Amino acid sequence: MKTYAIYDEEWKMKCPIGYLYYYDKCNEFIIELNRELDKWEAPLLFSSYVEKSIYTIPKEVSMLWVKGRVIPSGRQNIGSILKNHKMKSYDEMKLLELSGGRCSQDNCYIKKVEFEDVPLAIRKRSEDNVLECFTSGESDVICLFGDDTVRRIDLTKLVEANGKIASVLMNKDVYKSVKVGVGGYSIAFNDCIEIEKWLLLKTGKKINVSAKDLYSFVGDNIVDTAKACEILGCSKQNLTYLIDKGRLKPIKPNLKENLFFRGDVEKNSW
């Protein structure tokens, strides 16, 4: 993950208005805003979130912010522009870096920083991100969070907040496809229908995990070496490298074949 501070030359506090997290392996973005922003000071795209005291911007909206600040892929002379900058293909992040994140819409710009440079209060927001998730019954999802809590989310109660949930409940394969969204900021169905962490925490009921739920978890979220290689699109040799580097940990050592938590494997695809 790469981290960028977002500045606004017009903001009175003269410190970053937020931070852009770029997950380069999957080309996804998450923006964390400064809580001192009000809806009038926040970029227009984010004002409705700030008004609701939501300062973690979803990946789709974060991507829209990025796309609004770079040359569009459909521009007539995009080929020559990429060639001039020695780019083999269209890359939003590289174009954003080239422009410094500046555009005619406002006075915002970005500056590369280390994650450790992000204020602790903002970094701590990710401490309760989703670690694992799995389905239970016909319409529930069990989520394990970084703050060591487990919550049961009844999807039928979220249809009003997110109409796309209805299509999830009507298709068992889509329902079973649930996985942790990039960075743990959401859960995702079929890689396209997401429920943000704040909504999961708000509506989910804290539970003591039952044996039935654990059996479901084991069946859905523990994968062998072959499946791990399939998820990451890599060879067994590459998988061994990740294990040696401590980026992937087998559930139990000294087995004839390694087993992994699916969420731990998927983190290496972000």
Model region roles, listed by residue range:
Residues 194-210, 264-270:
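A short, Lys/Arg-enriched interface patch at domain edges and termini
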Residues 115-168:
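DNA-contacting interfaces and partner/effector-binding or oligomerization modules
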Residues 245, 249-270:
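Short helix-start
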Residues 33-47, 51, 164-185:
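Short, solvent-exposed cationic patches
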Residues 242:
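Residues in the recognition helix of alpha-helical DNA-binding motifs
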Residues 214-236:
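Polyanion-binding surface elements
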Residues 2-121:
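Broad phosphate/nucleotide-binding scaffolds in NTP-utilizing and phosphate-metabolizing enzymes
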